[in-house]
């Protein structure tokens, strides 16, 4: 089994996939120092799988599709098994009462992940974020809608999906984020 990680920070959001034998096709993070942590931990099979930059740019998307094609050729996969996306939560978190316009604009990065999922069509996709994630408004070209509506509009013809709020404290984490 394999996966792609978007907005992956230092790789914690998909650590369980790697720990359970999944192979990383590609991982994307905008901050180089965070991606270096993933490389230090040998997250991806190939060095070219570490995609350093903004996922909304054509350059990074092209690198992502190049990695997928490499795996289709060398590993005979049809499509990735999983895409896990952990978009920035600063503009979504109820703990952040002083949201700036930049943080709110970051909410719309999730639209990039939704669109990439619709193009790649992995067997499964996972969004990990704060409890308010699905009700947070995002927008593109002046049109605002809830993230849940954006997911439904772009992915409901391809996937059956469900949402669930999980508190990782119930699974061994030492703090609660709810």
Q: Where are these predicted regions, by residue range?
A:
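Class I S-adenosyl-L-methionine
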Residues: 64-80, 90-178
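Short, structured active-site "lid" loops
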Residues: 41-82
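Generic structural signal for short, solvent-exposed loop/turn connectors between secondary structure elements
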Residues: 1, 21-22, 43, 100-102, ...
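Short, glycine/acidic-enriched capping/hinge loops at junctions between secondary-structure elements
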Residues: 37-39, 62, 96
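SAM cofactor-binding core of SAM-dependent methyltransferases
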Residues: 3-58
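N-terminal Rossmann-like NAD(P) cofactor-binding module of classical short-chain dehydrogenase/reductase
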Residues: 4, 82-84, 126
């Amino acid at each position: 089994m394999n996966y792609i990680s978007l907005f992956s920070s230092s790789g914690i959001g998909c650590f369980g996939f790697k720990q359970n034998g999944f192979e990383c096709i590609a991982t994307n993070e905008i901050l180089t120092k965070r991606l270096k942590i993933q490389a230090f931990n040998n997250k991806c099979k190939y060095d070219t799988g570490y995609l350093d930059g903004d996922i909304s740019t054509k350059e990074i998307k092209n690198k992502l599709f190049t990695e997928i094609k490499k795996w289709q050729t060398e590993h005979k996969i049809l499509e990735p098994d999983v895409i896990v996306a952990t978009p920035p939560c600063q503009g979504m978190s109820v703990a952040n009462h002083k949201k700036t316009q930049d943080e709110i604009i970051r909410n719309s990065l999730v639209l990039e992940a939704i669109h990439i999922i619709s193009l790649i069509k992995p067997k499964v996709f996972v969004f990990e974020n704060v409890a308010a994630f699905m009700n947070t408004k995002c927008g593109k070209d002046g049109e605002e809608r809830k993230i849940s509506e954006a997911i439904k509009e772009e992915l409901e013809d391809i996937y059956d999906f469900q949402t669930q709020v999980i508190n990782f404290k119930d699974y061994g984490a030492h703090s609660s984020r709810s």
